[in-house]
């Protein structure tokens, strides 16, 4: 899969990056390469009932939860909105949901406010967390390809996800809310 050009492309990828960064090619010591689909989202369908866009589920959840946090009125508590990376590969990276980032940050906030470690543990016990994601609905043209038990339908309300291995934070209380 060509990422920069075909075999006949002139120059190196790192030369182009170095020029853009204003450094020498040999000054690039390492890299992380992120590829993004830059196609704009589109609304389509006979009644414009469908939205197609890259990363739609993650961005939709991030946006709507941030809007909810901003709209909320809570002067007694510290409200936190966390958007993590690497959910598609198991969340086990240092910036993923299984990392210590949130725990460490909340502890530092508590300690910075002059609270004790016990106060931090109490605040965690009183906290309410939501893990937001989209559920993939049954494709109307290929219903046989869908999960035989869990069958979300388009525009039929929210889906509450459970996982036997507790990979979601759904429990009786969060499901009831």
Regions found by a protein language model. Name each.
Residues 1-177:
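N-terminal hydrophobic/helix-forming segments and targeting peptides
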């Amino acid at each position: 899969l060509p990422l920069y050009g075909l075999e006949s492309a002139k120059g190196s990828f790192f030369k182009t990056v170095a020029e853009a960064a204003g450094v020498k090619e040999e000054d690039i010591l390492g890299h992380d390469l992120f590829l993004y689909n830059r196609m704009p989202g589109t609304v389509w369908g006979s009644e414009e009932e469908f939205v197609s866009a890259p990363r739609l589920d993650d961005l939709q959840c991030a946006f709507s939860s941030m809007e909810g946090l901003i709209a909320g009125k809570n002067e007694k508590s510290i409200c936190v909105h966390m958007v993590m990376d690497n959910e598609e590969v198991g969340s086990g990276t240092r910036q993923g949901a299984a990392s210590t980032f949130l725990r460490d940050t909340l502890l530092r906030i508590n300690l910075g406010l002059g609270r004790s470690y016990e106060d931090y543990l109490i605040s965690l016990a009183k906290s309410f967390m939501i893990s937001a994601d989209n559920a993939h609905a049954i494709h109307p043209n290929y219903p046989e390809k869908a999960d035989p038990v869990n069958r979300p339908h388009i525009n039929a309300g929210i889906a509450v996800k459970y996982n036997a291995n507790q990979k979601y934070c759904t429990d009786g209380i969060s499901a009831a809310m």
